[in-house]
A protein has these predicted regions:
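Short glycine-/acidic-enriched loop or helix-start segments at secondary-structure transitions
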Residues: 25, 80-82, 155
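Acidic/histidine-rich catalytic neighborhood of metal-dependent amide-processing enzymes
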Residues: 40, 98-99, 109-163
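Catalytic-core environment of secreted peptidases
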Residues: 60-115
């Protein structure tokens, strides 16, 4: 696991506007990153049903051992998400036993940070990169990134109807 790479990936993602129904730029970014990792990327036809400007992203990578595993997250964020400026602040993090300084990523302005669900996607991508770089045996891997989750799971619902 490379913490610097996770942070870099997350900061790249939060700079991409992706409100519900307008996830295409985020989908294109994710498709490119998954393709770089060797995944075959497709999009379903759910946009016709959800009204989004893209379908759900479905990516597959053949495994080296039997079995399969899946990861899922969503591409959209709530508003306001235009012009997000992420900043890294040093803050004291305290629990019952220890206090320490930690870096915290937050929004600099009047927008949300878009951590929901871009932090999840960054974590999935870093986990995938780490496994692939290790050369460890792995089962087939599927990644599903849905649209319009913030709108009553429209993308996931459209996918389920196609299944």
């Amino acid at each position: 696991m490379n913490p610097d790479r996770v942070l870099e990936s997350f900061l790249e993602m939060v700079a991409i506007e992706s409100p519900s129904w307008h996830e295409a730029p985020m989908a294109a970014y994710c498709a490119g990153k998954l393709a770089e990792m060797g995944f075959t990327v497709t999009f379903d036809a759910s946009a016709a049903e959800t009204g989004s400007d893209t379908g759900n992203l479905i990516a597959h990578l053949a495994g080296t051992v039997p079995g399969r595993i899946g990861f899922s997250a969503h591409l959209d964020t709530v508003k306001p998400c235009a012009g997000i400026e992420a900043v890294i602040e040093q803050r004291h993090i305290c629990d019952d036993i220890t206090c320490r300084m930690a870096e915290v990523v937050c929004s600099a302005g009047e927008t949300i940070l878009s951590a929901d669900d871009k932090a999840g996607i960054a974590a999935i991508f870093e986990g995938l990169r780490s496994v692939l770089e290790s050369g460890a045996p792995r089962p087939d891997i599927t990644v599903l990134l849905t649209t319009c989750e913030e709108q009553s799971l429209l993308g996931a619902g459209a996918l389920a109807e196609d299944a």
